[in-house]
C-alpha cells in the first residue's frame, strides 16, 4: 500500500513526524529542568520547542491526512483512524499546554502535567503509526514489502 503523499516514492509523513516527536519530548525535559531549577531560560527553551512541535505536527498532519483519505476501505482503516485521533489529541493537548504556559505564568505545574498527557497520546499515536507501517505495510511500496522474500529466493 503505497502513499500518494510522497516525494520520489518516499512517504512525506514519516519524514516530518520526527520534528514534533523530538521537539515535544525536548520541551518536556526542558520544562522539568525549569521546574527543578527555576532558571527562566529553561522555560523559554521549553516554550519554543513546544511551539515548534505544534507547527511540526500541523505540517506532518497534512500528508498524514492525505494518506488517510487515500486508504480507502481496508482492514487498517480503524488503526489509521485511531492513530489520527490520538495524534490530534496530542496536538490539542500540547497547544493548550503552550497557551497556558505563555499566558498563565503563575501556574507552572499545570502545563507540565498536560504535556505529560500529550506525551502519552503521542506515544499511543506513534505506536499505532508504527503498526500501520511495520505490521500492515501502509506507505510501503509493493516491491519493498516482498524484498526480504526476493532476497531469500536468490540466495
Predicted regions and their residues:
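Polytopic transmembrane helical bundles with strong interfacial aromatic enrichment
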Residues: 1-155
Amino acid at each position: 500500500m503505497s502513499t500518494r503523499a510522497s516525494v520520489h516514492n518516499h512517504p512525506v509523513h514519516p519524514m516530518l513526524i520526527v520534528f514534533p516527536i523530538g521537539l515535544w519530548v525536548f520541551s518536556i525535559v526542558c520544562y522539568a529542568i525549569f521546574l527543578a531549577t527555576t532558571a527562566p531560560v529553561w522555560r523559554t527553551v521549553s516554550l519554543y520547542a513546544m511551539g515548534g512541535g505544534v507547527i511540526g505536527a500541523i505540517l506532518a498532519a497534512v500528508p498524514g491526512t492525505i494518506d488517510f483519505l487515500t486508504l480507502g476501505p481496508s482492514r487498517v482503516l480503524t488503526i489509521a483512524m485511531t492513530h489520527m485521533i490520538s495524534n490530534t489529541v496530542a496536538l490539542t493537548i500540547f497547544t493548550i499546554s503552550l497557551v497556558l504556559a505563555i499566558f498563565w505564568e503563575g501556574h507552572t505545574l499545570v502545563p507540565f502535567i498536560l504535556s505529560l498527557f500529550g506525551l502519552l497520546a503521542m506515544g499511543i499515536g506513534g505506536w499505532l503509526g508504527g503498526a500501520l507501517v511495520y505490521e500492515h505495510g501502509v506507505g510501503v511500496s509493493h516491491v519493498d514489502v516482498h524484498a526480504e522474500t526476493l532476497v531469500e529466493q536468490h540466495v
